[in-house]
Amino acid sequence: MLVLGIESTAHTFSIGIVKDGKILSQLGKTYIPPSGAGIHPREAAEHHARHAPAILRQLLDMLGLALSDVDVVAYAAGPGLGPALRIGAVLARALAIKLGIPLVPVHHGVAHIEVARYTTNACDPLVVLVSGGHTVITGYSDGRYRVFGETLDVAIGNAIDVFAREVGLGFPGVPAVEKCAEAADTVVAFPMPIIGQDLSYAGLVTHALQLVKSGTPLPVVCKSLIETAYYMLAEVVERALAYTKKKEVVVAGGVARSKRLREILSAASGEHDAVVKIVPDEYAGDNGAMIALTGYYAYKHGIYTTPEQSFVKQRWRLDNVDVPWFYDLCNPH
């Protein structure tokens, strides 16, 4: 069974193909906003619409496949930016109608988790999903991913991106801020807003910008921001490990590329005899392969829709999604 997956939730448009549960390849293109600006949903959507046909053709040609070889089409149905989501959904519906094949709506966050589990051979981990749109500590229980802790305002990646943009470090913000932080050998005190199991990152950005305006060297502020943001995550991860007793920690999402985050989470997890497994860099950011893979799992368990009944959801909680395929991944592929 050949599944084509379409990702278009934010700044990246990507298509991936999975055959019988194995990732074959993916291809994508990322919208880079003008210097000093954030992602404009309409401009991201125009970018996706402009590049989608060529990406689809190139991927099929690269794999020696015809469009008619596709058995199922999956698409990221949310959460995300409405105009960008709709570009992927329209393409998915068009393909489903043209080919007469099933259509599978996929939750973007669940897809991040499943590609991380697939690539790390993790069975029943505590998951740390960190990206521009997600900051969630979650684990599986009773048919769904249950949230042990999450951001109460902005996601960690978004927060660092905003800071980087405001101080002129460019986009994407996380690697730029981490690079700047390398020049510092000290840190300054930051608030650590942890409310129960939940986190707040909006205030960290405000505090960091105030420090820059007051004359604190930029590398020192960058280092302090990064260390505080990551140690806040580690605190919640430790609490979740103490509660769940899980022995695997999977880090998924674009911020999983951070070497410093890996170090901090590995140290925290080691205190609970848990092993940290990191999604490979090529699958850390938004990608079509994770949509195709999750679409494959979902379709095998009877989850699909028709073009007339398909949807996009700009807001869609992770713990509102059934994952009946969860234990299928516990057997090595």
UniProtKB/Swiss-Prot annotation:
Binding-site residues for Fe cation, renumbered to this chain: 108, 112, 286
Positions of substrate binding: 129-133, 161, 178, 258
GO cellular component, one term: EKC/KEOPS complex
Name of the protein this chain belongs to: tRNA N6-adenosine threonylcarbamoyltransferase
Function: Required for the formation of a threonylcarbamoyl group on adenosine at position 37 (t(6)A37) in tRNAs that read codons beginning with adenine. Is probably involved in the transfer of the threonylcarbamoyl moiety of threonylcarbamoyl-AMP (TC-AMP) to the N6 group of A37.
Subcellular location: Cytoplasm
Organism of provenance: Pyrobaculum islandicum (strain DSM 4184 / JCM 9189 / GEO3)
One of the GO biological process terms: tRNA threonylcarbamoyladenosine modification
UniProt catalytic activity: L-threonylcarbamoyladenylate + adenosine(37) in tRNA = N(6)-L-threonylcarbamoyladenosine(37) in tRNA + AMP + H(+)
GO MF annotations in UniProt: iron ion binding; N(6)-L-threonylcarbamoyladenine synthase activity
Family: Belongs to the KAE1 / TsaD family.
Top class in the EC scheme: transferase
Superkingdom as given in the UniProt entry: Archaea
